[in-house]
Curated annotation (Swiss-Prot):
Cytoplasmic side: 1-60
Tissue: Ubiquitously expressed in adult tissues.
Superkingdom of this protein's organism: Eukaryota
Gene: abhd12
Subcellular location: Endoplasmic reticulum membrane
Keywords from the UniProt entry: Endoplasmic reticulum, Glycoprotein, Hydrolase, Lipid metabolism, Membrane, Transmembrane, Transmembrane helix
Topology, Extracellular side: 82-382
One Pfam assignment: Abhydrolase_1
Name this protein carries in UniProt: Lysophosphatidylserine lipase ABHD12
InterPro entries in UniProt: AB_hydrolase_1, AB_hydrolase_fold
Family membership: Belongs to the serine esterase family.
Length: 382
């Protein structure tokens, strides 16, 4: 009986131990669950912290961008000379590694580089490209030969380039080649402050340089036709120049405007650079008045009322730098000009599908026919 009682006590003790063990296991599981919950909460808090940090960084970036956005017009208003640099972009030299003294490096083997002095202390770089038919004869010739070549029967085009770059810019060189192949002498130059020309840029200085070159050419070609071709900002210089010549009673034989605008204020307002500020209250006061403060106008819309020679306007519909509508508006003004009454005024649009944009009209296979039709003369090939 004692054994059975002992056995019962042992069983009871074992059961109690097992029960206690189960209780401990339960406590262990509870502990594990408790440990798991805080871990999940920690991860969630970590994710929230990371999201909060990211949002804070984004807020800081937005604040910086807003500060810059506000600061730029204020800086330009306080320092209007900055706006002049943005109009001229003469400090942008593309391609940079080009020796303007060696036009042959650009494939211009019938081009002579030289320098002229429109006023004391200012030397400007000039290129003279002879007609392609004179290419062989032009090889290794000196300045005297090139100057005498003006005595040929070929007409001359004075080319006035736009802002940025130099007279050696690729799209400009390609146009010289096209015009040379059509039998024209092409004379082009870098305004003061551009390329290897001395001095600082200004509208008055650019126009004076163009007038000096025109007179220099005219003295050497006699009665032969002399046409003025302006591109982009160069159209503003061209209309300034032609207005002066017409006021003197000595108009050029024709004026060709490629991708022109009406005036610099309208062009600046339409330029892609102004897109982020165009609808800002006070845009004119901050940006456009800063241009006027530098005495920069390029008022072609006013100049056409004083021009008395044939005018041809070329403009691509997909031009994003000088919008097509500005060229069309200038044409409409020119067509109504009393001073142009009796002179041919023609507007040639180029479809967007052609992809000529701002500076590739030279690629048009129709360009030779357009020029010969406008100038009322066949091209002087050879």
């Amino acid at each position: 009986m004692r054994k059975r009682k002992g056995s019962a006590d042992h069983d009871s003790s074992f059961t109690a131990t097992l029960t206690d063990g189960s209780s401990d296991l339960k406590q262990c599981h509870k502990g594990t669950d408790a440990d798991t919950d805080p871990g999940g909460s920690g991860k969630e808090m970590g994710r929230r912290c990371r999201r909060g940090g990211l949002m804070w960084r984004l807020r800081r970036i937005l604040i910086w961008l807003l500060g810059i956005y506000i600061a730029i017009p204020v800086i330009i208003k306080v320092c209007p000379s900055i706006q002049a640099k943005l109009v001229f972009l003469n400090f942008v030299r593309v391609p940079y590694f080009i020796d303007l003294k060696r036009p042959q490096d650009q494939g211009m083997n019938h081009t002579h580089n030289f320098y002229l002095q429109p006023e004391e202390g200012i030397n400007i770089g000039v290129w003279h490209t002879v007609p392609a038919g004179m290419w062989r004869e032009a090889q290794a010739k000196d300045a005297e030969w090139y100057e005498k070549s003006f005595q040929s029967s070929h007409p001359v085009i004075l080319y006035l380039h736009g802002n940025a770059g130099t007279r050696g810019g690729d799209h400009r060189v390609q146009l010289y080649k096209v015009l040379s192949s059509l039998g024209y002498h092409v004379v082009t130059f870098d305004y003061r402050g551009w390329g290897d020309s001395e001095g600082s840029p200004s509208e008055r200085g650019m126009t004076s340089d163009a007038l000096f070159l025109y007179q220099w050419i005219k003295q050497r070609i006699g009665p032969k036709p002399l046409y003025i071709w302006g591109h982009s900002l160069g159209t503003g210089v061209a209309t300034n120049l032609v207005r002066r010549l017409c006021d003197r009673g000595t108009p050029p034989d024709a004026l060709i405007l490629e991708s022109p605008f009406t005036n610099i204020r309208e062009e600046a307002k339409s330029h892609p650079f102004s897109m982020v500020y165009r609808y800002l209250p006070g845009f004119d006061w901050f940006f456009l008045d800063a241009i006027s403060a530098n005495d920069i106008r390029f008022a072609s819309d006013e100049n056409v009322n004083h021009i008395s020679c044939p005018v041809l306007i070329l403009h691509a519909e997909d031009d994003t730098v000088v919008p097509f509508q500005l060229g069309k508006k200038l044409y409409d003004l020119a067509a109504q000009s009393k001073s142009l009454n009796g002179h041919k005024v023609q507007f040639i649009p180029f479809s967007s599908s052609l992809g000529y944009r701002h500076k590739f009209i030279y690629k048009s296979p129709q360009l030779p026919n357009i020029l010969s039709d406008f100038l009322r003369a066949p091209h002087p090939h050879g």
